[in-house]
């Protein structure tokens, strides 16, 4: 019986003979497996996926969208919110375990910046130590600047999210019904991010950050969604 060392030696000699016999052929041999970071296409095609999209995604730059939106927001919390940003921090739980359209998510977040700002407390809910309830309903058309790359077509249709949350200082339930879609209107529209509707520009940008958006102000006073986390 041959030893393991002898078997390995024979295997090496056989490999050398194969290399010599294949020398000058057009077939490709891997001397070593591809590196971990090397990007390869999947072995099977993905239906409906255009690989060319990945080539121009980073070069799209700043884009403009005209959106039609509507949002109905209902919130019940154990304790009253102390400020707008406190409300935003808690209402941000609306997207916990998000299962909606991924392409719409950044724009849902932008609408929520304004929807939370419009929330009003129900006076009846503040009596007799009951849990406070807040509601808001907003709708309109707006201009959105973004550098998020390719955005899929967005139909104006309703999605609904109901979530409960529990934090260090408060807990409750949030119910959101939201519509967002692209509109082809020729009207001049205001931006979705409007510091005049907030206490300050800093407050508005902080709210966007809490809701998972990175918003930057350009030299011509446009507010651009640069990232959605």
From Swiss-Prot:
GO function term, MF aspect, one: structural constituent of virion
GO biological process: viral budding via host ESCRT complex
Locus of motif PTAP/PSAP motif: 42-45
Chain segments carrying region Disordered: 11-36
One Pfam family here: Vesiculo_matrix
Membrane topology: Peripheral membrane protein
Gene3D superfamilies xref list: VSV matrix protein
Motif (dynamin binding): 2-4
Domains as described in the record: Late-budding domains (L domains) are short sequence motifs essential for viral particle budding. They recruit proteins of the host ESCRT machinery (Endosomal Sorting Complex Required for Transport) or ESCRT-associated proteins. M contains two overlapping L domains: a PPXY motif which interacts with the WW domain 3 of NEDD4 and a PTAP/PSAP motif, which interacts with the UEV domain of TSG101.
Name of the protein in question: Matrix protein
Species this chain originates from: Piry virus
Lineage summary: Viruses, Riboviria, Orthornavirae, Negarnaviricota, Haploviricotina
């Amino acid at each position: 019986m041959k030893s393991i060392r002898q078997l390995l030696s024979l295997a090496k000699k056989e490999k050398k003979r194969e290399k010599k016999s294949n020398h000058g052929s057009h077939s490709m041999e891997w001397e070593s497996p591809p590196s971990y970071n090397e990007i390869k296409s999947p072995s099977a095609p993905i239906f409906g996926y255009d690989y060319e999209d990945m080539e121009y995604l980073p070069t799209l730059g700043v884009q403009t969208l005209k959106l039609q939106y509507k949002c109905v927001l209902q919130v019940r919390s154990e304790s009253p919110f102390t400020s707008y940003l406190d409300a935003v921090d808690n209402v941000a739980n609306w997207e916990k375990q998000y299962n909606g359209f991924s392409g719409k998510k950044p724009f849902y977040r932008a609408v929520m910046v304004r929807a939370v700002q419009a929330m009003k407390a129900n006076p009846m809910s503040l009596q007799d130590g009951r849990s406070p309830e807040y509601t808001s309903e907003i709708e309109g058309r707006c201009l959105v600047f973004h550098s998020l790359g390719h955005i899929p077509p967005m139909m104006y249709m309703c999605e609904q999210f109901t979530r409960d949350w529990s934090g260090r200082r408060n807990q409750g339930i949030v119910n959101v019904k939201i519509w967002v879609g692209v509109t082809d209107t020729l009207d001049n529209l205001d931006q979705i991010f409007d510091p005049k509707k907030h206490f300050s520009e800093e407050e508005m940008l902080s709210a966007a950050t809490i809701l998972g958006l990175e918003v930057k102000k350009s030299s011509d006073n446009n507010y651009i969604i640069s990232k959605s986390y």
